[in-house]
Structure formats: C-alpha cells, structure tokens
C-alpha cells in the first residue's frame, strides 16, 4: 500500500488524508531508478539564492544552482564554477579563473560578465540576504571573458567560504532580467538539474540538464523534493519505498533503523546551532515584555535551562551541548565564555531583582516534531524558575516573516551553519544585517566583526572572536543551546552520498546500485 500524505496533514497530529496528485507523481516514479525522491522536513522558502534563507532551500539549490566554489569533507575550498583563484598581495582583491563551457539552463553562456551581474545583484537587490555576506566587496571587474576580480574595501578572510554558499550561486542574467521579482517562480541556474515545477507545500520537481558541464557525475533524470513535516511519515514512506532519502531523521528512530537492513543512516555534526532568539530591540514589541527589556530576565531564562538534559530529552543524545555560534570542538570557539550551568536558585533571584517573579512570554516555534518537542522541554524547565512559556506553533516560512518584522517575544531558530564562523555571526549581530532578528546593536561589536573579517591568521582572529563573545554573552539575546547531528536516512539501493559538514545532499556521484 502506498503511503502518501497531503501537505495539509503532514504534521505531528494528522495522518489520514491522501493527496492524489502527489501520490500520482510518486507512483509514476516507483521502480524507476532514474527518479531521485527526497523528503524534506519543511517546505523551502523562495527559490532565489539572493533572498532565500532556509536550510531546506539549500538542499534544493545543491541540485539546481552551482556555485563559484564548494567545500569538501574537510571544509577545504574546492573548485566548482571557478577553477582557480589567487589573492592580491594586499589581500584586498580576489581574482577568479572561471570554468569554460558552462551554460545556464536557458542556454546562455556562463562567463565573467555573469559573475559580475550576480555579485552586484546580491549586493543591491531589495530584500537581499546576501548583502551583509558580501559587504566588503566594493566592485567587480571583468578582466576577460573567463576572469573576474572581486575588489574589497578591506581584507576579507571568509570570502571564499561565502562564495561556497548562496552568495556564490550563479543565475542566468537574461532570465533574471526578464522575470524581475518573479524569478523565484521559475529559477534558471547552471546546476545539474533544471527547474520543472513547484506546488507549494507539496513538491518541487527538477529535471536533468543535458548541458551540464559535469554530466558524467549525474545518474538520475529527475529529482522530486517533498516537504513532509512529520518525521514518522517521512520514515514510513522511506521504508515503503516511496522515498530514496529523508533528511532530519528523528533521533528517537535511530536505534530501530540500525536493525533495518534496507536503510543506511548518515550522521554529520552540523556547522550551525539550535538557538533561542529573543527580541531585545527588533521592534516595539521588545519593550512590551520583561524578557526583551530586562537583561536580568534573559539571564534568568538561560540559567533555567539544562543543556545536557535538553540534548538527551529532545534529541536523544544526537547533538553536542554548546553556548556559542560554533561548537566547543570548533577552533574558533571562545573558551573565555564557558557553557553556563543550570542554577534555578540564581534564576529566581534575578527575576525577583527584576520585579517579575513570574514573567510570561510567547515562544515562536516551528511546527516540526523536533521543534515542538524542544519547545515543550524549554517550557517545563523554565517553569521551575517561575516562567510561563506559551508555545506559539508557526509554519516555518511564516515564522521567518514574523521574525523579520519583530513580531515575536522569543523564537526557536535552527541555523544550519557555514564553513567559516563569520557566517554564523556577522549577519546575526551586525546592527543593520538582515538576519539580526533580535535587534542587537552595539557599535563596538560592529567594529570587532569587521576586524575579525579582515584577519586571516587564525590565532589573531580567535582573540577578536573572544572579545565578541565576551560582549554578546552578557546580553543573552541569543541563547545557544546545542549543535545537532544532521541525520539522513536512505535506501541502500543508492550509493555515493558524501558526508559534507554543511549537511546538504549533493547529487553528483549519487547512483543506483
């Protein structure tokens, strides 16, 4: 019997209805190795790399949009659309040699002019979430057809790591100009698969691009991405043969899956974090709640949380306890700011000093099973200190829009992380940065963030990051809880998955056994 559930009912509490269109799409591909079927934990946001910001969107982009460079299993920068690069002697320019023979999905040539268009679009387009990532890039020079130079206002150590993600994704200038603000409805990139269709909350279908420069590495004709919130339903469909890969397997299912000879589990420690973001200045709403306007209340909340217990209860041990934007095992972890231990007595004392022994706030939470479980754990732990936490379950894309507007008290936010720590830090604490949902703004931190970006020597850079950690940790605007393990499950009928630390599924090299 085919297990196929409507997007409307892909939630923790609903299991019964069937969406015929999705079933038909899936059933048509059953038994055909040429179609790769991937279940996502959420529906991706916009399919435009300039404005996109979801992890699941990055999974789709990995099949759709090639980047200038990529990372490998050891976080080494490796070629993709750029074949080589060299820094200027003063480290204030990066010169990239581009791959010849690459075309976009509309047949247009990829060249230096296309790179210039894309970088400038990332920097100037209204609503761009890449602007902060590329802020040190001042101008882009086309040196010849296949050579481009990125000029910088100051040395920028994370630049190559930035170009290994959405800021380095190249879209067709011709298609972008023609589509305008509607580009995301039919994105045109240069990756191994081209866009075919999207049905919101149901499926994204990509078809093989025959003109792909590395087509020998592609062994499927089609990729179908299906958002299914409930991990139980994702797993049931994998076991029934409807899916080939599922992401974010529920940690509680890992033990049982180890005995299933048909299924392979991949575990990848994430580069990012699970955090609790608090609105301290994003909007007027921050001043309407004790949590937003009094740092003592925020410190009390942090002291009410038992991180090791949280990892065991909400993640079944499939995460590493943390308190910063990178994990304690990362070379850029600031050891001068250790993980705080739970202290209920001190938390109650702080609330008493703040004059709010029983503060109440809403916790905006994704509708995923993991998100709901974590919110309930936080609710129970915080209650012991006197907090009344009201869980506000919100669809993921909607939660991002509300966070943008500052319409929240606190927000459970997963950040998938970047190869360079700057990607976990700059856009979240810089005064005018697009991912600064909490409204944190300190000129001294802005100066340190810029200084950190300009230093390439690791030991010197760590000293700057330690200063940033010392300041931000006292504000408790983002409570870093833990660092998850990306848990992928797949049929053993397919081989070739690479365990890259960003947790993304790369289709190059995947093939049926």
Q: Predicted segment positions?
A:
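Extracytoplasmic/periplasmic ligand-capture domains
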Residues: 73, 99-129, 139-141, 187, ...
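Surface-exposed binding/hinge segments that line
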Residues: 6, 97, 131-175
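Bacterial N-terminal signal peptides
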Residues: 15-27
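N-terminal lobe/hinge region of extracytoplasmic solute-binding protein
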Residues: 39-89, 117-120, 188-189
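Residue-level recognition of beta-strand termini and adjacent short loop/turns
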Residues: 89-90, 144-146, 200
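Long beta-strand-rich cores associated with HINT superfamily self-processing modules
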Residues: 488-513
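Sec/Tat signal peptide C-region and signal peptidase I cleavage site
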Residues: 27-33
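N-terminal secretory signal peptides that target proteins for export/translocation
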Residues: 1-12
